[in-house]
From Swiss-Prot:
[4Fe-4S] cluster binds at C49, C53, C56. Belongs to the anaerobic coproporphyrinogen-III oxidase family. HemW subfamily. Residues 1-37 are annotated as: Disordered. SUPFAM superfamilies: Radical SAM enzymes. Might carry two S-adenosyl-L-methionine binding sites with only one binding to the iron-sulfur cluster. It comes from Bos taurus (Bovine). This is Radical S-adenosyl methionine domain-containing protein 1, mitochondrial.
Length: 442
């Protein structure tokens, strides 16, 4: 149900009143919408950065005379168009990512949120996250984003070591990072997430753990740990290939991850996903939608989405990718109302593979009820109950299959990639042997 314009403008005020509310249950995750429901999350991509970090191969550009008013107008148009095409009536969360969305004007954020609230129901307590870098996130700017409707921040600290920050090509220092973190916590208490990278060239376990322990003395209730991935085409990849830097040691990275998980658990953090840790119920409801294979709309250059185009008469979930280059994307939005470059219908098996691979990233795993929303006939017991490989994984203490569903143990989360090889193979085998059904796809 669309909101009248006056109600849309009042959304920010209502959101600020509701943002202190937090679910008391810290053992599960946010409720997952049915796969073909009229609910979705919304991702908004801001494509610009001050500079390209040495490790990054994301779709981002260094701004040269950006017409933000034109970009803002196109973000608004595309959000409204995709909401109409998808038939989505309720937006559960909004995430402004990039790029560096903290470089955007708060007016752009407000305009997108107002457009969403006009086209669909955006609850006052919806999670609205903005990614921020310390050098573009002064206290006054953060306050302005809060006034625009943002109620959660994700700060890309990456490291608290100045030498490592220089290696990564970051524009901030460790001191900048800590100052931004303190200001963010003052403005968004209990709703600030921080990223910390591990597995850098020449990085050692002890110094990295001391960084993490230092961060825990001043951080909020959400921490993400990301292992460096050397991506072809990045400066860091070239430096390692040419021998200017040592290749990251995967065994050391695995040790950092294991030790880091233990430190976070000791500090009261729940590892609710492979890379994400929260305490006091501070899970990211937006990212939870991804892991539970809920629908999400991707707005902006290069954004990805997964939804059923019900508003256009569709019945099959599609993977959608928007045009990468900002100028080309804006031209398409002005011509067609959206800049979708590629639409790939997902088969029933492809969707189930995503449900399995994404769901097992979480500590909750895949409940029987959740699986049946996507596949009512072939149960988790049918798939894995008699599997020799699954029994072996259970005996090793890595996997659990019981009355709740299928999930990794705490030890299993650390080696999920190796577990998925057996599980996906078993799913594919069982799918080929099944009796075809007429169950509609979600």
């Amino acid at each position: 149900m669309a909101l009248p314009r006056s109600q849309a403008r009042g959304w920010v005020k209502a959101a600020k009143m509701a943002q202190r509310r937090r679910p008391a249950d810290d053992t599960g995750g946010p409720q997952s919408p049915a796969p073909g429901s009229q609910r979705a999350a919304l991702y908004v991509h801001w494509p610009y950065c001050e500079k390209r970090c040495s490790y990054c191969n994301f779709n981002k550009y260094i701004p040269r005379g950006v017409d933000e008013a034109a970009l803002r107008r196109c973000l608004v148009i595309e959000a409204q168009t995709l909401l109409r095409l998808s038939g989505v009536r309720r937006v559960e969360s909004v995430f402004f990512g990039g790029g560096t969305p903290s470089l955007a004007s708060p007016h752009t954020v407000a305009a997108v949120l107002e457009a969403v609230a006009q086209a669909a129901h955006l609850p006052a307590d919806s999670e609205v996250t903005l990614e921020a870098n310390p050098t573009s996130a002064s206290g006054s700017r953060l306050a302005a984003f809060g006034a625009a409707g943002v109620n959660r921040l994700s700060i890309g600290l990456q490291s608290l070591d100045d030498t490592e920050l220089q290696l990564l090509g970051r524009t901030h220092s460790a001191r900048d990072a800590l100052q931004t973190l303190a200001e963010a916590q003052r403005l968004f208490p209990g709703r600030v997430s921080v990223d910390l990278m591990l597995g850098l060239p020449a990085q050692q376990v002890g110094p990295w753990l001391r960084q993490l322990q230092g961060l825990l003395r001043c951080c909020d209730d959400h921490v993400s740990l990301y292992q460096l991935s050397l991506e072809r085409g990045t400066t860091l990849f070239t430096q390692v290939q040419q021998g200017a830097l040592p290749a990251p040691d995967p065994e050391l990275a695995a040790e950092m991850y294991q030790e880091g998980r233990a430190v976070l658990r000791e500090a009261g953090f729940r590892q609710y996903e492979v890379s994400n840790f929260a305490r006091n119920g501070a899970l990211s409801t937006h990212n939870w939608t991804y892991w539970q294979c809920g629908q999400y709309l991707g707005v902006g250059p290069g954004a990805h989405g997964r939804f059923i185009p019900q508003g256009a008469g569709g019945h099959t979930r599609e993977a959608r990718i928007q045009t990468l280059e900002p100028d080309s994307w804006m031209k398409e939005v002005m011509l067609f109302g959206h800049g979708t470059r590629r639409r790939v219908p997902l088969s029933e098996l492809e969707l189930l593979e995503e449900v399995l691979a994404m769901g097992l990233r979480t500590d909750v795993g895949i409940t029987h009820q959740h699986w049946q929303q996507f596949e009512p006939q072939l149960t988790l017991w049918d798939l894995f109950g008699a599997s020799k490989e699954v029994k072996e994984l259970q005996e090793q203490g890595l996997l659990l299959l019981d009355h709740r569903g299928l999930r990794c143990s705490w030890e299993g989360l650390a080696v999920l990639d190796s577990l998925l090889l057996s599980l996906l193979s078993r799913l594919q085998e069982a799918w080929q042997q099944r009796t075809p059904s007429s169950v509609p796809r979600g």
